[in-house]
UniProtKB/Swiss-Prot annotation:
Positions annotated to bind Zn(2+): 73, 76, 97, 102
Basic residues bias spans: 561-571
Molecular function per GO: Hsp70 protein binding; transmembrane transporter binding; zinc ion binding
A cellular-component GO term for this protein: perinuclear region of cytoplasm
Biased amino acid composition, Basic and acidic residues: 540-552
Region of interest: Disordered: 540-571
Alphabetized PROSITE patterns for the sequence: ZF_BBOX, ZF_RING_2
Annotated InterPro entries: RNF207, Znf_B-box, Znf_RING, Znf_RING/FYVE/PHD
Keywords: Coiled coil, Metal-binding, Repeat, Zinc, Zinc-finger
Zn finger intervals (RING-type): 8-42
Protein name per its UniProtKB record: Probable RING finger protein 207 homolog
Coiled-coil region list: 527-557
Length: 836
């Protein structure tokens, strides 16, 4: 019957001021009489220095908790199970009062728990050093701390502070783990206690062995008397030693069981009804005591001293060997039986040692006959099982190494297969063991007939039995190891199933990277590679065109959103457009120069040109000496709706007279042929023609590229210039008085424009709606123009130099020489104007 752990082992009463000794025994303070040693472990006086016993706070807490009485209901003052406790009201309630008093909505926020869940705080809830309530728990020192303790700790040590709730959960987990270990320790010690108790109960076997010994010794009185006395003394001595050892170990185990029960009871109370603060304060002490108890060990079981007739006969055979000639090799081996069969697999197989003493010839004779036939039924399958077991053992060992050392991923099916094979071998070994047991009856008859061979056959038989036991134990261990690997393998496979998609499948490459990989994977001269490169270039070109279209659309939208300012209109009678779309005839004549002074009808909604551009064009017009008197040929200009609405208004011209003067050829411009010999009356009057000629010269000097290709855009023509030209045409070229006044106004506007060019501003004018509507109605307009103007002045020095030099004229030199001629002409013109 188990004792109450809250009772003293000396006075057999409940603890009063319990104290704890270093051996983990707890007694009353008055029972110890101030002795530093425990009377339970050592009843006599102890000469060794022991630690001073300390008050047992854990036992005191259990005593206080065990004496706690259930509180009455605060409303009806009765105890009716089940009982509840309202933490908000701090009152106990029965079931009826709870339903009556806490059903209103105002009590819905009250926290009501059962009385079993309520934990009363028996220890202090305030800090001993600062008298402040506990707010945190330190996991390093395993103590509760207040706000002052927290502020007093340095910053690098504050990482160990956790909340009381987290500390409570952590301590409960540790207590559960320690209690589980302690329960296992208790079960082992209880089993050892029962084994030793059974050994004491088998004392009657010694008397039977003594009687059989006397009967055997009577057969050989003279020789065996000495052996008898010796064996009897040894038996008595073994019995005394066994009894003494068992009694001593029983006392040790019983002494350990008391603290074990106390610690288990403490763990149960702390995990169920103890408050959080009590658990946090008492958990370190309980952990320490449990660790001390787990470190205690008990001596091994004594060797069984139960006499065996076979052992006695072997000793007698040794003593009678000089007389009877019996060798000890004919006697069976002595099997020492231990209390625990767990070490049986550790004993080495003695069959090889025993067989080494026998010759091959004797072994062949012993295995012949009926015994050999019976034994062959087990021997051959057993050898096969040994090979299979060795293979499976090696596989399990390699699997365990892959799992623990090599960190490999093992399939669950492989482990299950190993488990099945181990179970199969274990079943086969069990069947062979049963077959061996069944052979014993048949072998007894053979042993009776052949006494000399029985000894050797018994040796072989017993060794095989031991070998089977060893193999079965090994198979059990392998099976246990294989079963232990199953959850780990399942866990690893589950984790691998989650990680494998991310680890095995690389991310998709970018579109350009995939295209490049596809292109590089194709052979250099293959048609697929060429098509892929062309496709990529086409896509890139389309993307660039789309970007340009978007930019142009944005610019046009921004231009449309701008408001047009009101500016003065400038009318110039000599404002003309030069068509640079040249078509050279075989004789070198540019048909586009037949009517270079085409008047353009500009819409009132078009943007005005800057003053600087207008001035530059006026100077060029004066240099080329354009006059309306020389216009003889008539050119019809048709203005289309599309051209009229564009920013650079173009005219489709229909020439009535195709006879034109030839332009100077490229050889003349380069100086190879005298330019003066080929000068016609209509060369040089077109600015576009001159620029086109220069472009031809430059193109000959260097290959055409997008950078050196020049594009000349046509200028917008003022509407006033067009109207003046129409009036001059209708009035036979003579300006009227109103036209003269309008020309004077235009000159004034030009002067104003010149002053505005200094500010670099673009002047816009507001367009009237009526003018726009009127201009839109006139879709096409036909104009007639005069003959082209005379050839501009070109200094003779340029042609002389060109004719003298045999070198080719470079691009830069050609530009410089033409510009010098233009500057010389401008200076001469300015000098003539100043003289006038």
């Amino acid at each position: 019957m188990e004792e109450n752990p809250l009772r003293c082992t000396i006075c057999k009463n409940d603890f009063e001021e319990p104290i704890l000794f270093s051996c983990q025994h707890t007694t009353c303070r008055k029972c110890s009489n101030g002795s530093p040693s425990c009377k339970t472990c050592s009843p006599g006086p102890s000469t060794s220095r022991s630690h001073t016993p300390q008050p047992d706070k854990l036992a005191a807490f259990l005593l206080d908790a065990s004496k706690e009485e259930m509180e009455q209901c605060a409303n009806c003052e009765q105890i009716t199970l089940p009982m509840f406790y309202c933490e908000t009201c701090q009152q106990s309630l029965c079931l009826a009062c709870r339903n009556v008093t806490h059903q209103a909505r105002m009590f819905s926020s009250h926290k009501i728990i059962s009385s079993e869940e309520r934990s009363k705080v028996y220890s202090s809830s305030l800090c001993k050093d600062h008298n402040e309530p506990y707010i945190l728990y330190c996991s390093d020192v395993r103590k509760l701390v207040c706000i002052q303790c927290f502020n007093g700790r340095p910053l690098e040590e504050r990482h160990s502070f956790i909340s009381i709730e987290q500390g409570h959960r952590m301590c409960l987990e540790k207590i559960e783990q320690s209690a589980a270990k302690l329960r296992f320790y208790q079960s082992e010690r209880q089993e050892e206690l029962n084994v030793r108790q059974r050994i004491l109960d088998e004392a009657s076997n010694f008397d039977d062995a003594k009687t059989s010994l006397y009967q055997l010794c009577q057969q050989i009185i003279d020789t065996v008397m000495t052996t008898r006395e010796t064996l009897a003394k040894e038996l008595v001595k073994q019995q005394e030693q066994s009894d003494e050892q068992c009694k001593r170990q029983i006392k040790e185990i019983e002494a350990v069981m008391g603290p074990v029960r106390l610690c288990l009871f403490s763990a149960q109370i702390l995990c169920t009804t103890a408050s959080k603060l009590d658990v946090l304060q008492l958990c370190p002490q309980l952990q320490k005591r449990i660790s001390v108890l787990l470190d205690k060990t008990v001596d091994k079981l004594p060797v069984s001293s139960t006499p065996d007739s076979i052992e006695v006969r072997s000793d007698l055979a040794k003593s009678l060997e000089p007389y009877l000639g019996m060798s000890a090799a004919w006697c069976p081996i002595s099997v020492s039986r231990e209390g625990s069969s767990s070490n049986s697999y550790k004993r080495g197989s003695g069959s090889h040692k025993a067989l080494s003493m026998l010759s091959k010839f004797q072994t062949t004779i012993d295995l012949a006959g009926a015994f050999g036939q019976l034994f062959g039924k087990v021997e051959h399958p057993l050898r096969q099982l040994v090979v299979e077991l060795s293979s499976i053992s090696q596989q399990v060992l390699e699997t365990q190494r892959d799992l623990t050392i090599r960190r490999c991923i093992i399939e669950k099916e492989d482990v299950e297969k190993l488990v099945k094979m181990c179970k199969k071998i274990e079943a086969s070994l069990g069947m062979h063991s049963a077959a061996l047991d069944g052979m014993q009856s048949e072998m007894q008859e053979i042993w009776q007939e052949q006494l000399d061979r029985v000894r050797r056959q018994q040796i072989i038989y017993r060794e095989k039995v031991e070998e089977i036991l060893n193999l079965r134990e090994t198979a059990r261990q392998i099976l246990t190891a294989a079963k232990q690997m199953v959850p780990y393998v399942s866990c690893i496979l589950n984790m691998n199933a989650m990680i494998a998609p991310k680890r095995c499948h690389p991310p998709d490459p970018a579109p350009m990277e995939s295209i490049c990989l596809e292109i590089t994977g194709i052979e250099p001269n293959s048609q697929n590679r060429i098509m892929a490169i062309e496709k990529e270039e086409e896509n890139r070109r389309l993307n660039q065109e789309a970007k340009k279209k978007e930019e142009l659309a944005g610019q046009s939208a921004a231009m449309k959103s701008l408001k047009h300012g009101k500016t003065k209109r400038k009318e110039m009678h000599h404002r003309m457009m030069l068509n640079t779309n040249r078509e050279r005839s075989p004789g070198g004549t540019d048909s586009a120069l037949t009517s270079p002074c085409i008047r353009r009808l500009t819409s009132t909604a078009l943007k005005e040109e800057t003053a600087s551009e207008l001035d530059a064009e006026e100077i060029l017009d004066e240099i080329f000496e354009l006059s309306g008197e020389q216009y003889e040929e008539v050119v019809d200009g048709t203005l289309t709706e599309e051209d009229r609405c564009s920013s650079a208004l173009l005219l489709s011209l229909e020439l009535q007279n195709e006879s034109v003067s030839p332009l100077p050829s490229l050889e003349q411009l380069l100086g190879r042929i005298s330019l003066a010999s080929r000068v016609t009356s209509d060369i040089g009057f077109s600015r576009g023609a001159m620029l086109q000629s220069l472009n031809d010269v430059f193109a000959l000097q260097k290959p055409p590229t997008p950078e050196n290709i020049s594009v000349s855009e046509e200028r917008n023509v003022l509407a006033s210039a067009v109207r003046n030209a129409e009036k001059r045409k209708s009035g036979a070229g003579l300006p009227t008085t109103s036209e003269k006044e309008e020309m004077i106004e235009n000159d004034e506007i030009i002067v104003e424009k010149e002053t505005e060019t200094e500010k670099k501003k673009v002047i816009r004018r507001r367009v009237k709606k009526a003018e726009c509507e009127q201009s839109e109605e006139d879709v096409t307009t036909t104009f007639t123009f005069g003959p082209p103007p005379d050839c501009p002045f070109v200094p003779q020095e340029i042609f002389d130099k060109l004719g003298e030099s045999d070198e080719k004229l470079g691009t830069f030199e050609a530009k410089e020489r033409v510009l010098q001629s233009l500057k010389q002409k401008m200076n001469q013109k300015n000098g003539i104007d100043n003289d006038n």
